[in-house]
């Protein structure tokens, strides 16, 4: 009897103690939540942080992600989150504009800015056309399944209207040039619209891309000079085509398994394990053509120094390339922006040195005449 009463008393005390503890814990949790709410109400992001406390980023992808949500699919359709393609389209234009500058002068900054704007618009238009043609294929490839048209974020009709807007703005840029350049620029539209079809009918779609992407090598010179100089523009155009065959073959190795399954063609599937041999051949052809450009345009030592640096970069790129690792292919592909910038820098510095060499030659002639 006493044992049962004692046990009941113990159980009662235990129950009261647990109730008190849980009540205290509940009050403590309430205080903690209240403190958190007060902190959240008064919290302000520190410098370098976004609204959610994450580090701010000025990368193209971060800028697109911070844009109003309805605009984001259209910005991604233009590939503004991946600007490497715009750079690769723009850089041959800068080479041509730089080569067309008068000896001792910097390139025409107005033309550089005009062509930069045109590169953004035409690359966006080209990507829109490409995604419209390839929407059914893109759904079957892991890397491209999230593209706006393939994912259903933008309808075919809206993408067509958006394409019209981009081409209209690009036409406005083109009309700022001389008549020769307007006609030359308009001629590139055939290449822009047909390139996306090439991967269905030939193993050389990268060649078609090279013909399209390097049109600025012709257009930049004509925009400055009024017409093309074949001795400079044609080898420059050829070198750009070889360059595109290099970087886009590397790029194509990212999707070679999916492409083989769905029946698309590329130089990556054509060259297979011989890819590095082909890339080496394209590199030699590219450097040879750029050397001819230098001779025909009277380039000076900085230009040829830049070509040596480009050769070293290409050799390292090809030697270290792992064609079976998509991450490495993307890294090597994007590094080609550096190659384009080195060539542009070599052209600018080489052109600035032309005036010094001309002055030295003039002084030597005058000294000989005096003697």
UniProtKB/Swiss-Prot annotation:
Bilayer topology annotation: Multi-pass membrane protein
Cofactor(s) needed for function: Mg(2+)
EC number, as in UniProt: 2.5.1.39
Alphabetical list of InterPro entries matching this protein: HB_polyprenyltransferase-like, Prenyltransferase, UbiA_prenyltransferase, UbiA_prenylTrfase_CS, UbiA_sf
Record's keyword annotation contains Lyase: no
Keyword Transferase attached: yes
Catalytic reaction annotation: an all-trans-polyprenyl diphosphate + 4-hydroxybenzoate = a 4-hydroxy-3-(all-trans-polyprenyl)benzoate + diphosphate; all-trans-decaprenyl diphosphate + 4-hydroxybenzoate = 4-hydroxy-3-(all-trans-decaprenyl)benzoate + diphosphate; all-trans-nonaprenyl diphosphate + 4-hydroxybenzoate = 4-hydroxy-3-(all-trans-nonaprenyl)benzoate + diphosphate
Keyword vocabulary terms for this entry: Isoprene biosynthesis, Membrane, Mitochondrion, Mitochondrion inner membrane, Transferase, Transit peptide, Transmembrane, Transmembrane helix, Ubiquinone biosynthesis
Entry's Gene Ontology molecular function annotations: 4-hydroxybenzoate polyprenyltransferase activity
Membrane-side (Mitochondrial intermembrane) residue stretches: 105-108, 193-200, 253-277, 322-332
Transit peptide, start-end: 1-45
Transmembrane intervals: 84-104, 109-129, 172-192, 201-221, 232-252, 278-298, 301-321, 333-353
Entry GO terms, CC: mitochondrial inner membrane
Pfam families per UniProt: UbiA
Compartment list: Mitochondrion inner membrane
Top class in the EC scheme: transferase
One Gene Ontology biological process: ubiquinone biosynthetic process
Residue intervals annotated with topology Mitochondrial matrix: 46-83, 130-171, 222-231, 299-300, 354-371
Family: Belongs to the UbiA prenyltransferase family.
PANTHER family recorded: 4-HYDROXYBENZOATE POLYPRENYLTRANSFERASE, MITOCHONDRIAL, PRENYLTRANSFERASES
Name listed for the protein in its UniProt record: 4-hydroxybenzoate polyprenyltransferase, mitochondrial
């Amino acid at each position: 009897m006493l044992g049962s009463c004692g046990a009941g008393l113990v159980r009662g005390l235990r129950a009261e103690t647990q109730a008190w503890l849980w009540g205290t814990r509940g009050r403590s949790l309430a205080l903690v939540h209240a403190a958190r709410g007060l902190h959240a109400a008064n919290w302000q992001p520190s410098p370098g942080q976004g609204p959610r406390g994450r580090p701010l980023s000025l990368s193209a992808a971060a800028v697109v992600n911070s844009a109003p949500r309805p605009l984001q699919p259209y910005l991604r359709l233009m590939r503004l989150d991946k600007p490497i393609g715009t750079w690769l389209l723009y850089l041959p234009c800068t080479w041509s504009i730089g080569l067309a500058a008068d000896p001792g002068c910097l390139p025409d900054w107005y033309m550089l800015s005009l062509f930069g704007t045109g590169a953004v618009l035409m690359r966006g238009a080209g990507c829109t056309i490409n995604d419209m043609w390839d929407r059914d294929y893109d759904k079957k490839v892991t890397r491209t399944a999230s593209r706006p048209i393939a994912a259903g974020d933008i309808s075919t009709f809206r993408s067509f209207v958006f394409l019209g807007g981009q081409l209209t703005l690009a036409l406005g840029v083109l009309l700022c040039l001389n008549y020769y350049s307007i006609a030359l620029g308009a001629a590139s539209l055939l290449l822009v619209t047909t390139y996306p079809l090439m991967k269905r009918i030939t193993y050389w779609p990268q060649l078609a891309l090279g013909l399209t992407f390097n049109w600025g090598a012709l257009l930049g010179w004509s925009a400055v000079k009024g017409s093309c100089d074949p001795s400079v523009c044609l080898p420059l155009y050829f070198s750009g085509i070889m360059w595109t065959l290099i970087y886009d073959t590397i790029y194509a190795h990212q999707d070679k398994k999916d492409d083989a399954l769905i029946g698309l063609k590329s130089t990556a599937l054509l060259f297979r394990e011989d890819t590095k041999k082909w890339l080496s051949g394209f590199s030699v052809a590219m450097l040879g053509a750029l050397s001819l450009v230098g001779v025909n345009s009277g380039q000076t030592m900085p230009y040829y120094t830049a070509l040596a640096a480009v050769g070293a970069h290409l050799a390292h790129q090809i030697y270290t390339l792992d064609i079976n690792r998509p991450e490495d292919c993307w890294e090597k592909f994007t590094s080609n922006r550096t190659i384009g910038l080195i060539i542009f820098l070599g052209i600018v510095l080489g052109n600035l040195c032309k005036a010094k060499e001309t002055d030295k030659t003039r002084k030597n002639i005058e000294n000989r005449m005096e003697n």
